[in-house]
């Protein structure tokens, strides 16, 4: 997996101060996407053990609330496979910090369902690591600058207490 960018001390992509990882690769190609260059799976730099260690170290300070995954598309199956070991390490090291994940896929139909478009052999484990999932493709006609943590009104901010039982997260 490649990644397009890392933002340290990010306050735009989740509650609190966070480290945000922008992965490369996305098959949605939403018109109006804010990060078109990250559609290409080969864009950016390889995600290595050193990258993972740097991200983990950036989350050590108490003022860092957690990690945010964006893209590109973190829930593309090939990205899930690369991210899962890192997310497991993150949860082991920081059990009180949260993980936010932005995806153009829809939770119930594309990720949770065994025949979903993005469901693969690691999806269930990946979702166990995610605390807040912002789901749904960006739709330019539904763009609303007043929305917190999402770009279009079709997107939902879901708190995942356990896979299969999401709740809308109050923002």
Annotated model-derived regions:
Residues 86-93, 122-125, 129:
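Catalytic-core regions built around general acid/base machinery
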Residues 35-50, 62-77, 96-116, 127-141, ...:
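Core AdoMet radical
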Residues 52-60:
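Short, charged beta->alpha transition segments
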Residues 48-52, 80-87, 115-122:
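Charged helix-capping and loop-helix junction motifs
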Residues 86-91, 143-171:
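P-loop/Walker A phosphate-binding loop and immediately adjacent motor/lid segment at beta-alpha junctions
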Residues 12, 108, 166:
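Flexible, glycine-rich phosphate/dinucleotide-binding loops
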Residues 28:
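Glycine-centered loop/turn positions within well-structured domains
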């Amino acid at each position: 997996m490649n990644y397009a960018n890392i933002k340290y001390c990010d306050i735009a992509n989740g509650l609190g101060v966070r480290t945000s990882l922008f992965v490369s690769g996305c098959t949605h190609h939403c018109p109006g996407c804010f990060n078109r260059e990250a559609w290409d799976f080969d864009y950016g730099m390889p995600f290595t053990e050193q990258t993972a260690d740097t991200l983990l170290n950036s989350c050590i300070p108490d003022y860092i609330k957690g990690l945010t995954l964006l893209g590109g598309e973190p829930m593309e199956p090939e990205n899930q496979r690369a991210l899962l070991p890192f997310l497991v390490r993150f949860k082991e090291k920081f059990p009180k910090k949260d993980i936010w994940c932005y995806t153009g896929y829809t939770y119930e139909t594309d990720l949770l369902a065994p025949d979903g478009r993005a469901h693969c052999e690691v999806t269930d484990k990946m979702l166990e690591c995610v605390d807040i999932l912002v789901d749904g493709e960006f739709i330019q006609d539904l763009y609303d600058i007043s929305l917190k943590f999402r770009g279009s009104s079709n997107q939902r901010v879901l708190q995942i207490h356990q896979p299969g039982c999401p709740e809308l997260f109050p923002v």
